[in-house]
Amino acid sequence: MEQRREPVYLGIDINDRYAMISYYQLNMSEPETVSTIAGSEVFQIPTLLAKRKGMGQWYYGDDAKKMAKTSEVICVDSLLKRAVNGDTVRVEEESYEAWELLALFLKKVMDLPTKLGNVPVCDRLILSVERLSKENMEVFWKIAPKLGLSQEQFMVIDHKES
């Protein structure tokens, strides 16, 4: 007989400097916040992407921050602000919509609990931002399908609600 899996809820608190991800299942007493380094208590993930020059390889968070100290990558910061402003970002010869880069960052952050072996796939994502606005909601609704989420699986709240 197949064992029923508890749904997995991911929560990402994001601003222009950092993101933090937690997950929760109904069989847990409280959510667990995930570190990018197993066993570490450092939970803040820099909201940053870095693309290796001449390649399609993207780094995020602390890896992007470390790689930024070399000349091997081109960094993109302020992902949330750029996406809300509707910016286009030029990286080498390629132009990217900032919301697409924010979606890439969020996808990489969402994969973190699974990579660390903590949880299977996400059933529902809750994003928490400092303040909700029409502009950031438009960006997030555009991003949801890129993350493989339907409107029923995706929610955005502000810090007052969280």
Protein language model features and the residues they cover:
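Surface-exposed acidic, glycine-flexible loop patches that form ligand/cofactor-binding
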Residues: 1-3, 115-120
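Early-domain small/polar-rich strand-loop-helix modules and first-structured segments
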Residues: 1-88, 153-162
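Gly/Ser/Thr-rich loops at beta-strand to alpha-helix junctions
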Residues: 16-18, 129-137
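Short hinge/gating elements
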Residues: 63-64, 84-96, 122-125
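Phosphate/oxyanion-binding active-site loops and adjacent basic polyanion-contact surfaces
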Residues: 75, 95-106, 136
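Phosphate/ATP-binding catalytic cores across multiple sugar-kinase/actin-like superfamilies
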Residues: 101-117, 162
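Short glycine-rich phosphate-binding loop at a beta-alpha junction
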Residues: 118-131
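Short, low-complexity, polybasic intrinsically disordered segments
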Residues: 134-149, 154
